[in-house]
């Protein structure tokens, strides 16, 4: 169990309840960015095969701004009791291409946030899971309706929701965060879920303390449940605060995770490669050449 945070010591029943600059990118154009890194089949490895994985993506903070920061006690408790990847880096700036890298193995040449992006039926983590008989769902805070493709709505931003860009991920699998299960229903979670807080709660517009409190309120129960239910929580960031170094926090917490600080260099492609390896999925995009993370797992 996580320690040192009041909310995590309570019973689960008391846990806190633009116009596109480069236009629509046709699937045929996007395919030209991935031609050199084809989808490659891979047998399931000896990595743990989790019943459920929840991936939370935060915004625009460097590792130095988060790890050791007293304004982020929940995240630092996850880091202290999980696998803290001390040399994790994003691919580029700004936000959107990093989300695409994490979800589909490629930035697709984006150099600015663009809406809409049309990824067509190019392979991605969601489509791979579905093709292999697993399940996927994306939970986005303030998404105005199931399957909505709007570019923005209040504090919701489509640029942070990569699965919406692909026709091989059914729109019914893009849902508001309000649909995220309560603790008693965690066994019904999809195989892999993405959780995207709104711009206030992902540290983009709001403070580190606000983002940490949101995670504590909404994901602490899942984090504790995951430890004893063959499940995993991954918390990462899209990019840092705009520096050329682009070093980001990334933490794995849950069952089979051996706590510690790990110093191998990783990127969003390595995280994607790890998830694909866990479920025996084809490696897609630049995940093809990104080794999976193998040293953080124990009994």
From Swiss-Prot:
Q: Where in the cell is it found?
A: Secreted; Host cytoplasmic vesicle, Host phagosome
Catalyzed reaction equations: a phosphate monoester + H2O = an alcohol + phosphate; a 1,2-diacyl-sn-glycero-3-phospho-(1D-myo-inositol-3-phosphate) + H2O = a 1,2-diacyl-sn-glycero-3-phospho-(1D-myo-inositol) + phosphate
UniProt cross-references to Pfam families, sorted A to Z: Phosphoesterase
Coiled-coil annotated spans: none
**Signal peptide per UniProt:** 1-43
EC number(s)? 3.1.3.64, 3.1.3.2
Q: Which cofactor does it need?
A: a metal cation
Looking at the keywords, is Endoplasmic reticulum present? Answer: no
Assign the protein's first listed, main location to one coarse class: secreted
Activity modulation comment: Phosphatase activity is inhibited in vitro by low concentrations of several heavy metals (zinc chloride, sodium molybdate, magnesium chloride, and copper sulfate) and moderately high concentrations (>8 mM) of EDTA.
GO BP term (any one): phosphatidylinositol phosphate biosynthetic process
The main enzyme category here is hydrolase
Q: Which SUPFAM superfamilies match?
A: Alkaline phosphatase-like
Q: Name one GO cellular component term.
A: cytosol
Keywords from the UniProt entry: Host cytoplasmic vesicle, Hydrolase, Secreted, Signal, Virulence
A GO MF annotation of the entry reads:
phosphatidylinositol-3-phosphate phosphatase activity
Q: Does the keyword Acetylation apply?
A: no
The lineage's top-level taxon is Bacteria
Phenotype on deletion?
Strain lacking this gene is defective in the arrest of phagosomal maturation as well as for growth in human THP-1 macrophages. The mutant strain is severely attenuated for growth in the lungs and spleen of guinea pigs and has a significantly reduced ability to cause pathological damage in the host when compared with the parental strain. Also, the guinea pigs infected with the mutant strain exhibit a significantly enhanced survival when compared with M.tuberculosis infected animals.
**pH dependence comment:** Optimum pH is 6.5-7.5. Significant phosphatase activity is observed between pH 5.5 and 8.0.
Write out the domain note. Answer: The C-terminus of SapM is required for interaction with RAB7 and SapM-mediated autophagy block.
User: What does the subunit comment say?
Assistant: Monomer. SapM interacts with host RAB7 via its C-terminus.
What is the role of the protein in this entry? Answer: Virulence factor that plays an important role in blocking phagosome-lysosome fusion and thus participates in the intracellular survival of the pathogen. Acts as a phosphatase that dephosphorylates phosphatidylinositol 3-phosphate (PI3P), a membrane trafficking regulatory lipid essential for phagosomal acquisition of lysosomal constituents. Therefore, SapM eliminates PI3P from the phagosomal membrane by catalyzing its hydrolysis, and thus contributes to inhibition of phagosome maturation.
Protein name, as recorded: Phosphatidylinositol-3-phosphatase
Gene name tied to this protein: sapM
């Amino acid at each position: 169990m996580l320690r040192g945070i009041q909310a995590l010591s309570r019973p689960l029943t008391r846990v806190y309840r633009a116009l596109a600059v480069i236009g629509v990118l046709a699937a045929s154009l996007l395919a030209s960015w991935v031609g050199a890194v084809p989808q490659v089949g891979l047998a399931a490895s000896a990595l743990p095969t989790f019943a459920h994985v929840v991936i939370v993506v935060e915004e625009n903070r460097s590792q130095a701004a988060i790890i050791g920061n007293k304004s982020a006690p929940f995240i630092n408790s996850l880091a202290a009791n999980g696998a803290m990847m001390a040399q994790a880096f994003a691919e580029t700036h700004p936000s959107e291409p990093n989300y695409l890298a994490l979800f589909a193995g490629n930035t697709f040449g984006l150099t600015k946030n663009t809406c809409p992006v049309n990824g067509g039926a190019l392979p991605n983590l969601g489509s791979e899971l579905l093709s292999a008989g697993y399940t996927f769902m994306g939970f986005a805070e303030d998404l105005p309706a199931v399957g909505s493709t709007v570019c923005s709505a209040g504090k919701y931003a489509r640029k942070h929701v990569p699965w919406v860009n692909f026709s091989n991920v059914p729109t019914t699998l893009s849902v508001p965060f309000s649909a995220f299960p309560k603790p008693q229903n965690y066994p019904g979670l999809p195989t892999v879920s993405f959780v995207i807080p709104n711009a206030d709660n992902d540290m983009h517009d709001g403070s580190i303390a606000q983002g940490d409190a949101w995670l504590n309120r909404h994901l602490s129960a899942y984090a504790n449940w995951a430890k004893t239910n063959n499940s995993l929580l991954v918390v990462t960031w899209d990019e840092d605060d705009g520096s050329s170094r682009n070093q980001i926090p990334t933490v794995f917490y849950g069952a089979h995770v051996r706590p510690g600080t790990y110093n191998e260099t990783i990127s969003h492609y390595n995280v994607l490669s790890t998830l694909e390896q866990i479920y025996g999925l084809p490696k897609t995009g630049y995940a093809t050449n990104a080794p999976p993370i193998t040293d953080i797992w124990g009994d």
